[in-house]
Amino acid sequence: VKTSASGGTSGYDAGKKTVGRKRFIVVDTLGLIWALAVTPADEAEQDGACLVIHETHEQATSLKTIYADSAYNRKGLPKWVRQTLGIQIEIVRKIARGFEVLPKRWIVERTFAWLNHDRRLSKDYERRTDSAEAMMHLGQIRRMLARLTVN
């Protein structure tokens, strides 16, 4: 996510050629956030994944499987998580060419899209990463309250 000019912790993601931060989330099948982390964009995906997987494991000790994309299949992360936490990481693979909706992966992308509807979350305006995480929590709370009031 691009950051504003207000300063704060940010990094350069060479893969996306973006200066900003990375957001990591673990969601359930309804798209509700169990854990989230915001890191500078130059940190590796494995570092952010470890943060959110540990936080999720503390809350849901009966968790058996986490679905992830291929970025999290590097440096032995799935093996490490399986051995230390007893959680299986299944890598959802993309097809070689074209577009295909990947059902498990789509839940995460849909949640990010819902969060980006908030003006404060469409771009990272916060100076500190803990403030950015708090704004994501507030966005999730707003979304859950909107669901409750509709029914």
Regions found by a protein language model. Give the residues of each.
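Polybasic low-complexity intrinsically disordered regions
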Residues: V1-G86, R93, G139
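Basic, amphipathic alpha-helical segments enriched in Lys/Arg and hydrophobic/aromatic residues
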Residues: K79-W80, T84-G86, G98-N151
